[in-house]
Design a protein with these regions (language model features):
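Aromatic- and charge-enriched surface segment that lines or borders ligand/interaction sites
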Residues: 66, 112-163, 277-280, 328-330
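Structural transition elements
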Residues: 228, 357-398, 413-420
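Periplasmic binding protein-like
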Residues: 48, 409, 427-460
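Gly/Pro-rich hinge or "lid" segments in bacterial periplasmic/extracellular proteins
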Residues: 84-89, 94-103, 107, 156, ...
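N-terminal lobe/hinge region of extracytoplasmic solute-binding protein
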Residues: 47-119, 156, 223
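Surface-exposed binding/hinge segments that line
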Residues: 117-121, 125-130, 145, 163-211, ...
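Extracellular/periplasmic solute-recognition and catalytic clefts
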Residues: 165, 175, 231-242, 269-326, ...
């Protein structure tokens, strides 16, 4: 089978900023240095523009295997495993916890699973917490305790989907309930990423088996054991989550244990326009903005000094995908030419103001042993990150394209950073005779082009 797309790998992650709006009299200290009040208060609401603030939910049904599922249902549905936040840097621990779906092994804790053990290399046993309940959901289910059959149902449901990604759980043979609170995973082969693929990944939030009798794509039917339930959804506007006061978990602060959650409501605000987003941060209509482009940070710090900040390296990376099933992009020389024609270091220095890394994708330094620095890679890889337009022209000539060629490149208008960056990349390509036409697209059309494999020769 021919591959439909291949990455150019123009750049790795830019540094992101998170802004938290406190009251005007709040001390201007970083979040990790803030001292919690001695008596945490219950109630109120949070208005958040998340990392995906420009996008509404794509699907509420796990069987659709959409990449954004856990973002939209993560406050409602829980996982077997999760991160132990007591090991966060903000609490004196070693971990930043800013990586996308990566939890270091020494920071792994049970969420719905109370404990787990390997009976042999192909048999993993998880014992579920007792006293964890699904709340009553009219039209879906009565209140009842989570049990092992729910876990079995969940994995059978997502694995039987026609949209299943077999590479994610292909190593899994079957799942069985040994008793009411014991689940056994039988593997075809051992996979070292078992904790992510079975425990805390994108596609394994636990559902009640009553979902088999309702429309899983209807947001009104979404339910889980988590600290919130979704109570309102208006596409392109807001997703509201209301506290589940029957939630099982707690938080120890000082010497006192508090039931969770503290807040009554969380609103995910969908804000497609960057100017509107920045205005909402300044005026307090947003309590948290999870991603602020660095170009906007200095002005926000000046106009709204009460904002508290944190920063991290974005895990997604910035790259251009190419169709390699048609000429001339099926030619390796052409793809290498496109790569070395772009001055990546100049983009880091000038476009991102130094707040980016040339090589930190698909693995970032915080991924530990997974990460291999560019300096340790083969010379053929290192060459792709050195700006050399003269060699790029020679490669095109060697590929039979001395005069260059034309291509179309698609970009989602939902990503201001890409909209601003792409003309710069196109200008680099023009210097070697590659004439690229930029095609901005709304997200629905952009996603449809990707999933139906009708996308242009390139997209970012």
């Amino acid at each position: 089978m021919k591959r439909k797309a291949g990455p150019v790998g123009i750049m790795a992650g830019a540094v992101c900023a998170l802004a938290v709006l406190l009251s005007a009299c709040a001390p201007r200290t970083p979040p990790e240095a803030m001292t919690p009040s001695p008596e945490p208060q219950y109630g109120g609401e949070l208005n958040i523009a998340t990392v995906y603030a420009t996008l509404s939910a794509l699907s509420w049904d796990p069987a659709d295997w959409v990449w954004k599922q856990n973002h939209d249902t993560g406050a409602v549905r829980e996982l077997l495993l999760s991160a132990d936040l007591s090991k966060a840097r903000s609490r004196g621990g070693p971990h930043a916890f800013t990586m996308d779906v990566f939890v270091p092994r020494d920071a792994l804790r049970g969420e719905l699973a109370e404990s787990w053990e390997w009976e042999d290399p192909l048999r993993l046993v998880m014992r579920l917490r007792r006293g964890v309940f699904f709340p009553e959901k009219p039209g879906v289910m009565k209140r009842r305790e989570l049990d092992a059959e729910d876990v079995v149902y969940t994995f059978n449901y997502v694995r039987s989907s026609p949209r299943v990604q077999p590479t994610v759980m292909g190593f899994l043979d079957r799942v069985e309930a040994r008793d009411s609170h014991t689940v056994v995973f039988h593997l075809r082969e051992y996979n070292n990423e078992w904790d992510y693929r079975l425990g805390y990944g994108y596609y394994n939030a636990i559902l009640p088996r009553e979902m088999a009798d309702v429309d899983a794509r209807d947001w009104r039917n979404v339910t889980g054991t988590g600290p919130f339930s979704i109570s309102r959804y208006v596409s392109a506007s807001v997703q509201t989550y209301t506290a589940n006061r029957d939630y099982w978990d707690s938080e120890e602060i000082g010497q006192t244990t508090y039931r969770l959650p503290f807040v009554d409501r969380i609103n995910y605000r969908i804000v497609k326009d960057e100017a509107t987003f920045l205005s909402a941060l300044r005026t307090g209509k947003l309590d948290i903005g999870e991603v602020v482009r660095w170009i906007n940070v200095p002005q926000l710090k000046e106009t709204t000094p009460e904002l508290q900040w944190n920063r991290w390296l974005a895990p997604q990376g910035t790259l251009i995908a190419l169709r390699v099933d048609r000429p001339p992009l099926d030619n390796r020389l052409v793809r290498r030419a496109l790569n070395i024609a772009v001055n990546k270091q100049e983009i880091v220095d000038l476009f991102y103001g130094g707040e980016a890394e040339v090589m930190a994708f698909p693995q970032l330094p915080d991924f530990g042993a997974y990460f291999q620095p560019l300096g340790e890679m083969p010379a053929s890889v290192q060459e792709l990150f050195v700006y050399d337009p003269e060699k790029a022209r020679r490669l095109l000539a060697e590929a039979g394209l001395p005069d260059g060629f034309e291509l179309n490149i698609q970009v989602c208008s939902c990503t201001p950073d890409h909209m601003d960056l792409l003309p710069l990349i196109v200008s680099y390509w023009e210097k070697i005779g590659v004439r690229a036409r930029i095609q901005p697209m709304e997200y629905a059309a952009f996603l449809s082009a990707m999933t139906t494999r009708t996308h242009a020769e390139a997209y970012i």
